[in-house]
């Protein structure tokens, strides 16, 4: 790794706040009492598969070799191990697409919940948002660069979820990836469809579907498939549904 200089802390913070308040009126969300929906949180725990258990052991063995200096840092390091661990925690097929799609996994549990909420919200055309920063769709970008013309389409969690939702009866036009809206005009059109209930499940990453996204009108549920690196990204995710302008009094 390389050492970096980073901001650490403020000095004389009380004095700084006094100066700042001479030109600014600061109110936090809890002081404003904005009309936002009540949020009910659910933690869905999935048991690891046998393949995942074995792979976790391999990650531990790799970490021991890295800490012991038995491997070249260019070949393996803790950043690579941590990245593989995040992928493995989401779905074993991200590591090896030939591994089986087993029932009860995190992705399959999420699909079940999406379908249940979709059916329950049919009358009001209620919508859902799925956040996933891992295994995002890259096929269109690759094709534009001429890299994926003759190769098999890579496995992604996004495609897997969409295929399963369609197989269970959800119309394809009601499912959208934020990655397909690659211009501001396309994003605006997509967001309008979500607010109108025409697109009822939208899947995206925190970077593309986080700050600045206003699709809250019919949002009834938000699914966090993975956990982002920065705590503030979770706040941005939550802010898409716990927001003024949501017609639902209670969301999940």
Predicted regions mapped to residue ranges:
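Conserved helicase ATPase core of P-loop NTP-dependent helicases/translocases
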Residues: 162, 166, 171-206
């Amino acid at each position: 790794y390389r050492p970096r200089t980073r901001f650490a802390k403020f000095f004389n913070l009380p004095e700084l706040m006094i100066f700042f308040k001479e030109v600014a009126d600061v109110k936090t969300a809890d002081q404003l009492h904005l009309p936002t929906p009540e949020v009910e949180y659910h933690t869905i725990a999935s048991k690891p598969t046998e393949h995942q258990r074995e792979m976790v052991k391999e990650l531990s063995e790799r970490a021991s070799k890295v800490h012991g200096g038995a491997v070249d840092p260019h070949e393996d390091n803790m950043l690579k191990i941590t990245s593989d661990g995040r992928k493995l925690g989401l779905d074993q097929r991200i590591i090896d697409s030939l591994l089986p799609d087993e029932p009860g996994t995190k992705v399959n549990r999420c699909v079940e919940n999406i379908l249940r909420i979709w059916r329950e919200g049919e009358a009001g055309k209620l919508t859902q948002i799925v956040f996933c920063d891992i295994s995002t769709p890259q096929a269109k970008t690759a094709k534009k660069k001429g890299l994926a013309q003759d190769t098999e389409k890579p496995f992604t969690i996004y495609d897997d979820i969409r295929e399963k939702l369609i197989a269970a009866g959800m119309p394809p036009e009601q499912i959208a990836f934020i990655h397909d809206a690659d211009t501001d005009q396309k994003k605006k059109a997509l967001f309008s469809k979500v607010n109108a209930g025409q697109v009822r499940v939208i899947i995206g990453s925190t970077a593309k579907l986080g700050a600045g996204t206003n699709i809250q009108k019919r949002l009834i549920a938000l699914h966090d498939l993975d956990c982002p690196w920065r705590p503030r990204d979770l706040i941005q995710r939550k802010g898409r549904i716990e927001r003024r302008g949501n017609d639902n009094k209670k969301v999940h």
